[in-house]
Every structure is written in structure tokens, then in C-alpha cells.
Amino acid sequence: YDYCEHYSPXCDSSAPEAAQAQEPPVDEYAPEDIMEYDYEYGEAEYKEAESVTETPTVTEETIAQTEANIVDDFQEYNYGTESYQTEAPRSVSGSNEPNPVEEVFTEEYLTGEDYDSQRKNSEDMLYENKQIDGRDSDLLVDGDLGEYDFYEYKEYEDKPTSPTNEEFGPGVPAETDITETSINGHGAYGEKGQKGEPAVVEPGMLIEGPPGPAGPAGLMGPPGLQGPTGPPGDPGERGPPGRPGLPGADGLPGPPGTMLVLPFRYGGDSSKGPTVSAQEAQAQAILQQARIALRGPPGPMGLTGRPGPVGGPGSSGAKGEMGDPGPQGPRGVQGPPGPTGKPGKRGRPGADGGRGMPGEPGAKGDRGFDGLPGLPGDKGHRGERGPQGPPGPPGEDGIRGEDGEIGPRGLPGEAGPRGLLGPRGTPGPIGQPGIAGVDGPPGPKGNMGPQGEPGPPGQQGNPGPQGLPGPQGPIGPPGEKGPQGKPGLAGLPGADGPPGHPGKEGQSGEKGSLGPPGPQGPIGYPGPRGVKGADGVRGLKGSKGEKGEDGFPGFKGDMGLKGDRGEVGQVGPRGEDGPEGPKGRAGPTGDPGPPGQAGEKGKLGVPGLPGYPGRQGPKGSTGFPGFPGANGEKGARGVAGKPGPRGQRGPTGPRGSRGARGPTGKPGPKGTSGGDGPPGPPGERGPQGPQGPVGFPGPKGPPGPPGKDGLPGHPGQRGETGFQGKTGPPGPGGVVGPQGPTGETGPIGERGHPGPPGPPGEQGLPGAAGKEGAKGDPGPQGVSGKDGPAGLRGFPGERGLPGAQGAPGLKGGEGPQGPPGPVGSPGERGSAGTAGPIGLPGRPGPQGPPGPAGEKGAPGEKGPQGPAGRDGVQGPVGLPGPAGPAGSPGEDGDKGEIGEPGQKGSKGDKE
């Protein structure tokens, strides 16, 4: 077997050569003394289909021809270098023998005859046609052995030490398994070929010579013993498959479809760039990272279907394997050779091999994103408990189901508590100056500022236009009498004196009429949050939105109860033929067949290896042919046959309990940065800033014209009001008055653009699982499923006990060969094989419709405090407050500078 596999690539199969005795002959052969030499001789003549018989006819002419042909046929075979020469004999344990030999030999094994040329008597020595196949080791020879000496190795001392290819050992019939073609009564056994020359064996060497050529056809031999039953023929055509089984019960509903709806705001016409909002990009990034988790776990395995109906009877089974050889029958009359039979048909392919063991578990993957909890499935009916099956191998990932429909929008949750005020944001960059506003109406007069320090004297201004004459001042008191001066020239006008102290503040005038409305002031800070208004009327139903992106898969819902058992489906179409099954184990031994007719003469077998020198015995006298010996003891149990084909698939076991939750996976990769959050609430109002510094004093007015001398007159009437002077520069800002009353609420402005999306909040805790729904009605009968694959073939039954030995039959007359009998009726159906392993998990069923919406979950926990919002837009300026009360009079100012000299007084009265 080894040699065939490793040294002869053209070998068809492991050659089933049986044992050949190569040991020195002893009185008893124990089973371990029978050695096996598995050699592949490489020539087409010696295939395993021939059986070799010994019927020597000695004719002188063929000896020379035998020697000449040997060298030609086997020139390329170099026996000196073959590796099997050094192989030690092994004990017989190969798979080639149907029954290992355990019988005890009752006489010395005949390893060869003396083939010297003196023994050329041409009498026909008829040996029994004994098949030497290792099964029947009682070598009782019916013929006359007296004229044959056992071979003695006398000549090896005289021969040269390097034997040549022309020197061959004694021919021992090669022992091969008797196959069907040589025992079915269609070939007569031929005669034995001529003897070869004696072999030359050096001490300690085994040299194998090539086989000689075939001898001439001998006379017709006597009919052989009943041969053993042949090996089984190729299996017949495969029977039609049985009717398909009933469809299985409905599987559990699939996991709910994805329900994640992400609102996306697409850019309008005026947006720059691609119309992908930051929110959508963020969702895409999240979904890409969660793409692994989008495929839900495969659904649980469906319940086992009911067994299918019993199939019809199959076609006739394959022929059984070779049986044990029957007892030796009486010697039959030599029959004429029959015609050669036709070769049998090729058998059908064997069934599929068994399913392999599941592979090692792969490395643990990263933890997927937590899915949303699934809706609980409807509870089915409880199924009958099946027998515990072996755990099936993990199924392949199912195809991802189609997206479910978008569920109805949930009710709005309750408003959360108001968030804390965020920290004040950093001041933004200084904006560009706005367009100058329209001048507002003059504000109310501010409180009097403190007296500023006198400014430096301004440059002399151009003289102003002549003012209107002022009102006459009051008459001054008479001055002291001055000395009589000469009238002097009119002096140059003096410089302006400093302004006098400001007068006391007059009383406030009446309130003026309402001025035109001023420009809108800056927007005020938003007021506190109002009380939640009453619910408005429910709006009209909106149009159906676009399909949202896939949500994360939900948690696996609780397992529903088993559904009602469906009705029996229609019988499915016939399935395709299954693959070829493996060859079954050997069947029990058949009854011994009738004696076959004598076959044709077989080809000359390969000469065996030369035996060891036997002990020289005295030549015995010719004895009478003995009776057939009794059967030997029952042989030891044979080597286990090849494993039978895999049994039929057993019923599916119950579903295992739910496994423990796996460990939390590593955190996923960091998500992309979220968009800006919505603006936070405005910060608290800051404290009032300090009062600004006092403004600089205005420029000095132009000097008035010099007054004329004269007595002061009586005060005249009040002159007309002068023209209004140009508006002076604005004075310093007054102190901020108290806040005026809130103006009436203006009309609601247009809705602003929506703010940028806030960052995604942390995932809330999963809501409580919904209550279990009520049990649904059984669904309509489903369409019959596709045919499952053919089940695996059951294990073969145990081998039957060997039958009792029949009595030897009487010698029958030679009958003509009968026509072949009709095909036997099919045997009874065998018992069902043991349950096969659990089949592969079925394909995932279609995604069920979305279940009813669960009850509203409890409000989630309060989320973490959001980031501080941006500063709000400045509110509108409030209406101007009412004028404040008049301030207290200011402190007296510093003393003014000395005025210019007055005009000269009028001349006093003369006393």
C-alpha cells in the first residue's frame, strides 16, 4: 500500500495483494508469522483481477522460451536498487484482507517446487484449484504430492556472489484477491506454466527476479472449489428522492427594521458649497462607523418541520460485499469454459461526506454600537420539545433585511428643567461701525454735572456779529467820586472776562409734547422664561417626510411564543439529485453460491520472493487424497471496515438558552466633531459701569464791544428773544436715569434662520421594553418552501452474525448455464438511521412588518448641562424714561477773573 502510493504514481488504487509466506516453513503458523509484502509489479498483466492457479504441465520446448522472454519484458526493472528490498516483513494488518488469517497451518507451506531440468516428466499433475487469498489457510492439497520434493537451497554456495537478472527464484503463485470477474463461472482455469530455473540466494539476501512469460495453454483443469462471494458491484442508479417534507413552522419574526430618523437641513439656493449639512455629515460619519452594527444578529433558528411522508421503495440495492468463503465442496466434474460475462454498469455516486467540524472561533470583533431596543414580537404557541441536538455550527451572516417603514412620530416629551446660566462668552471682535442713525429727538436734560476745572484760555476768536442790544441793566450804585480826569481817549476793548458763575437751575418747565418716535434702540435682554402656554390646537398632519437614514439596530426583542402550527404545505417539486455518496461498509457475508464452472487459464503470476531454505524431509509415499478438512476455528475479528456513510439528519434539537451578555466592547473611535450648539441663554446683566469723566469746557466766546460811558439807566423792557444760536457741542453724558416702564410689545418679528445644530446629546438610557402583545391569529398558509437538500445517508446497520455452516451438498451433474434470473424484489425497508447532525441554519426569513409602537417610555434622565450659549443679540433700546427730578443746586463755582474796566461813568451832579 505504501509502495503503491509513494513509488508508483500510475497505480490505480491500493493493490489488495494478500499475504505470501516468506518465512522458513515451521510446523504451525501462528497468525503473526504470516507476513505481508505489498509490492506493485508494474505490468498490466498482473492486475488484481486475475486469479492464478497451479496446474503444471511439463513440456520441454517452453523452458528456453520462458527464459528468453523474461529478460526482454523486464529489462527496465532494476531489482538491485528497489527500496522494497530492504523493507522488513510486516505483520499482516492491512486493509486489503477481508478476514485476517488466524487459522493454524496443518502442514508446511509449499513455497516452491524443484524446478531443475531433470524433472521434465510430462505427466499432468492436477492441483486443486485453490484460491489463495489469505482467507482459507488450510493448504490441503488433494493432488499427489509425492513426486515433488520440497525445494532445497543446495546450490547457493557454488554460484557467484552477484546474481544476474537471469537467475530467478522459484515461482510461487502470486496471491491476489479474487475479484468478481474470475469467480462468476464465466472462465475456465488454465494450466500451470513451466517451471523456471532454481534461484540463487546469497545468505542474508532476498533477491526478487522478474516474472517469466506466460506458459502455453494447458489442458482443461478440473472445476475449482466454490469461490468466495465476490465484492459488491458498483451501486445501482440512485433511486428517486422521497417526497419533500412538510414545510416547517413559521420562524420567529425578524428583528424590527431600523427606526432612527435624523433630520437633515439642506442648504438653500444661496448656500455655498455642497448641499450637505453639518448634521448630515455628522450622521453619515456616525453611520459609517456603525455600519458594522447595522446588520442585525441572525435570527434564531426556525423550529423543526414535521418529518416528510415515507418515500416509495427505492430501486434494488447494490450487490453485497464479498462473503466469507463457504466450506469446501466435493470436487465437481470439469465443465466447459463459459463465455465471458459483460462488465457491470458503473455504480451511482456515493452520498456526500459528513459535514466537517466547525472551525475555531474567530477573534473577537470590536463591540458594535448599542442598537435601539427592538419591539417585542408576538408570542407564539409553545412548541413541542424536540430531542436535544448537537450544537450546530455558526451560520453564515444572513442577508441584511430591507429597511422597515418609518414609524409614527412619538408624542413630544415633557419640557426638561431649565438649564443653568452658562458662563459669559468671550467678547467677539469689534464689528464695523454701523451707518449713522437718524438724529434722535433731544433727550431730557441730564442732571447737572460737577463743575469742571477751568480750561485754558482759548485763542482769540473772530469778533462775532453785533448782537442785538441787550436789555437795559439795572442802575448801578453811584460810584465814588473820582478825581477829575481829563477825558481820556477811548481805550481798546479789553479782553473778555471769565464767565460768571452759573446761575441756579431754574425750575423744570412743563412737559413738552411727545416728540416723534426715536429710532429703535438695541434689543433688550430677554425676559425670564414665561409660563408654559396651554396646548395649541393640533396642527394638520404634515406630508410624509423623506425616508430617514437607517437607524442603529435595536436590541433583540424577547423571544416570542411559538406560533400556531401551519397547515401542511403542498408537495414541493422533486429535488435535484444529491452528490455521490461514499462507499458503504462491507455487508454481511452472503450465502455460498453454487460451484462455478472452470475458468480459463489465468496468466502466469508474478514469481514470489525466494523462500528460506526448508528442512529437508524424506520423500513421502503418495497418499490417497484426503477428505476435505473440517473448517478451522473462527478467525479473529477483522480490521474495522471503512466508516459507513453519514446517517440521516436527525431532528433539530431545542433551541439553546439565551447566552450571557458578552462583555462590553472597547469604545468606538472618536466621532467627528459636532456642529455648533444652539446659542445658550444670555448671561446675567453686568454691573453698571463707572461714570465717565467730565467733558472739557466749551470754547471761550468772543469779547463783547466796549460799553459806552453813561449812567446806568433804568432797566428797560425785556427785549425780544434773540435768534437761536448754533447748537453747541453735546455736553457730557448725564447719569443714567432709572429704567423707564417697559414699552408695549412690538409686533412679532419674522422668524430668524434656524441656529446651527447642537452637538448630539449622549445616548439616553434605553426605554423600558414594551409589554408583550397579545397572541396573533395564525397566519395564512405560506407558500411551500424550496426543497431542502437530500438528507445524509443513515449509518449502515451492524453486521449480521455469520450463518451456520451448511452441510456439504452432493455432487451435482454438470448442468447447462442457466439464463440470468430476474431481478429480486426490493428488500424490506431498513430501520431509520440515527439522527444526523443539525443542518445548516436556514436562510433568514423576510423581515416582518414593524410591530405596533410601544408605550411611551418614561422620560429619560436629565441630560448633562449643555455648553454656554453665545451672547444674545442686543435687545432694542427701551423708550426714553421720564425726565428725572431737578437736581439740587450745584456748589458755588470758583471766583471769576476780574472783569474788564467798565465804561466811564457819567459826570456826577454838582453839589
From Swiss-Prot:
Compositional bias per record (Low complexity), positions renumbered to this chain: 15-24, 216-228, 408-429, 484-495, 642-670, 685-694, 708-727, 738-748, 799-808, 825-841, 853-877
Biased amino acid composition, Basic and acidic residues: 574-583
Keywords: Collagen, Extracellular matrix, Hydroxylation, Repeat, Secreted
GO molecular function, one term: heparin binding
Ranges for region Disordered: 1-31, 73-130, 155-282, 295-911
Keyword Cell membrane: no
Annotated stretches, region: Triple-helical region (interrupted): 187-275
Stretch list, region Short nonhelical segment: 276-278
InterPro entries the UniProt entry points to: Collagen, Collagen_superfamily
Modification note: Prolines at the third position of the tripeptide repeating unit (G-X-Y) are hydroxylated in some or all of the chains.
Telopeptide, as annotated region: 279-295
UniProt subcellular location: Secreted, Extracellular space, Extracellular matrix
Domain Collagen-like: residue ranges: 209-257, 296-353, 749-807, 806-864, 851-909
Chain intervals with Acidic residues compositional bias: 104-115
Residue ranges the record assigns to the propeptide: 1-278
Skewed-composition ranges (Pro residues): 466-477, 843-852
Region (Triple-helical region): 296-911
UniProt cross-references to Pfam families, sorted A to Z: Collagen
Modified-residue entries (Allysine), positions: 379
Gly residues biased stretches: 308-317, 350-359
Residue spans of biased composition, Polar residues class: 78-98
Region of interest (Nonhelical region), residue spans: 1-186
Family, similarity comment: Belongs to the fibrillar collagen family.
Function, in words: May play an important role in fibrillogenesis by controlling lateral growth of collagen II fibrils.
Listed name of the protein: Collagen alpha-1(XI) chain
Organism from which the protein derives: Bos taurus
